[in-house]
Amino acid sequence: MEAKHLTMGCCYLSRRLNQLSSHDPLWKRHCKKYWLISDEEKIRRNQSWKAIFVSTYSDLGRYIQYYATLKKAWDDLEKYLGQRCPRMIGSLKESVQEEDLDAVEAQIGCKLPDDYRCSFRIHNGQKLVVPGLMGSMALSNHYRSEDLLDIDTAAGGFQQRLGLKQCLPLTFCIHTGLSQYMALESVEGRNKYEIFYQCPDQMARNPSAIDMFITGTSYLEWFTSYVNKVVTGGYPIIRDQIFRYVHDKECVATTGDITVSVSTSFLPELSSVHPPHYFFTYRIRIEMSKDALPEKACQLDSRYWRITNAKGDVEEVQGPGVVGEFPIISPGRVYEYTSCTTFSTTSGYMEGYYTFHCLYYKEKFFNVTIPRFHMVCPTFKVSTARMETNHNEYAVDEDEDSTDTDEYEDRRRVMDIPAPSGRCPHHT
């Protein structure tokens, strides 16, 4: 009798579980949580929530822990670009299928991480065009714009040579040849799935001695952190491009009616670890309040810099104007310019002031504070080839900090900018 009751109870429980599992509203939450399916999309697909979840899971189930995060990042990025850089949207490629990703794994002989695969199930990178999705940087004689590579182009650039063994390029700049790579195996001192800019050891005679500036610990972290900076306004949009200048909100100084703010960027393609030569560019914005009186209009005459490296060494620099110009600032007007500097230490900071004269009272001069702004190079790893090689095999080459940023920039106009595998230009 007890066995009969137990059997009947199990049957009832099974029927109840079956009824619950078919209750469509229960599947709605999972569809929205894991696949970001909207009510509008459900109507368009004309399927039940359960059917949508099951069909999507059968296709993308292996990515369930990544899909919602990456899909939201892509959706946010597309929405933002549609408003701020619409022409960039046209360079994005449609998604690839599982068999395409499997074929690439077979071609390169390495497994791709699931977060990377998941992203390419949403968008297959972009066309090799300018501007690049992964950000730009420009100086008077130097331009970088990184495209997010599609899966086939990335596979074609897969590296097996010493120094970059089993590394897959994620980005590429057609102007500089610069790429960010992802390590598909833990070899040559790299962690698996670590992302980095290559930086040849210029003091080594061994071409496999390649140092690395680290930009991410996984594809998910690398891509979503970049997108977050873009869509929250962390990177400025200049001439319909994403420029990778970082602005510290504390780095603002107001003197009277004039406000000065600074954003900075590290340029890995013009930097090296050996010898220590770290190249930074900075963008300065000078603005006069729109509420200032007309007679407050003034002209910039000169600049003064106090430059301090990580060792505490201080250098003072003075010069006329900025980047060869003597801008006039009037109520509501903004003036922006870009310049650069180098350090032989991994970090440093600059501060100073501009000297202006009033246009209405030509004998009246005053100083405007430039806030202190810090420049720090990314975390880097030294090539294992260096650690394994006799120090006698390394050349001796000393580098110095730049002495005057504007003059340094002028001198660089007559230099050829090398590809990442070349030798970084030095200040002389």
Predicted regions and their residues:
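Short, solvent-exposed beta-strand/turn "edge" segments of beta-rich domains on protein surfaces
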Residues: 266-279, 292-296, 327-331, 343-345
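Short, well-ordered beta-strand segments enriched in hydrophobic/aromatic residues
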Residues: 280-288
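A surface-exposed partner-binding patch
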Residues: 3, 10-13, 19-178
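Intrinsically disordered, low-complexity Pro/Gly/Ser/Thr-rich segments with frequent PxxP/GP/PP motifs
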Residues: 312-347
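Short acidic, flexible loop segments centered on an aromatic residue
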Residues: 292-314
